[in-house]
Amino acid sequence: MGKTTVALNASFALARRGWRTLVVDTDPAGAVGLSLTRRMAEAPGLAEYVGRTRALRDVMVQTKLRELSILPVGRVQVEDAMGFQNLLADGAVLGRFLAELQDRFDLVVFDTPSGFSGSTLGAMRVSRHVICPVQAEPIAARSAVRILEVIGAMRERGAHVGLLGFLVTMLQNGDASSMAVAEDLWRSLPKELILDTTVPRDGAFLEASAAGVPVGLLRRRAPPAALIFDQLAAELEARAGLTASREGQDEPIALVD
């Protein structure tokens, strides 16, 4: 399971918990749009906003869930991908973008390309929190610590970004190799840097991706895998201090009068 699957499903779960959430695709490959519908994959989006050919209100997509909106990456030709990434790298453009949003959203989730360049660095420079999915596979786990160095360097230069946590994904409880990678990660990093929630390898995620929906909308009665992202959303709320911002607004609900 990759970053886009995590971004979409976590955002959906957070939106269902009442947070006004915007998912922004900064990957020139258009991973968010490709994960949903062909129409969204071909729609104008961030690239057109950045190029000043479309207003922000014209490129944001309102989903059927009122609290969830999506900004696809837009039409980025292969030959223009590097220039697009370079344009976002210093964070200035994305900073202006966030300023224009003002108070319309509680959460803005950037789905970025893999690696530490271009739009990934730009998004990190303007963000408060980073979630780093780490597949429970040897190659992916070896690169996990690199993000701590990048965040540290950014903070030394004045950025406010911090690591909300590593999210272990594709975990196979019955597979010795998969468990060994996860256990090595749990052993080598401070406990507070690793999210308690883990995402298993589950066919429901592939099925949902093929259907172009979050796993929570795969069927009218959501599969058990959807509960994992509900748990993740609750954990992210607590770690990011979101619940404190609504203290006093979340009272017990009586079951009967």
Spell out what each predicted region is:
Residues 38-43, 150-151, 182-185, 213-215:
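Short, hinge-like loop/turn segments at secondary-structure boundaries
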Residues 9, 13, 35, 122:
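Active-site signature of alpha/beta-hydrolase-fold catalytic machinery across serine-
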Residues 16-17, 22, 102-103, 107-197:
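Conserved catalytic-core segment of NTP-binding enzymes
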Residues 56-57, 64, 70-116:
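Cytosolic-facing regulatory segments adjacent to core modules
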Residues 20-21, 29-72, 195-196:
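Phosphate-binding loop that captures ATP/GTP phosphates
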Residues 1-29:
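Walker A/P-loop phosphate-binding motif and the immediately C-terminal alpha-helix
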Residues 28-29, 76-77, 138-139, 171-175, ...:
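Conserved nucleotide-binding/hydrolysis micro-motifs of P-loop NTPases
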Residues 156-257:
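C-terminal lobe/tail of nucleotide-utilizing enzymes
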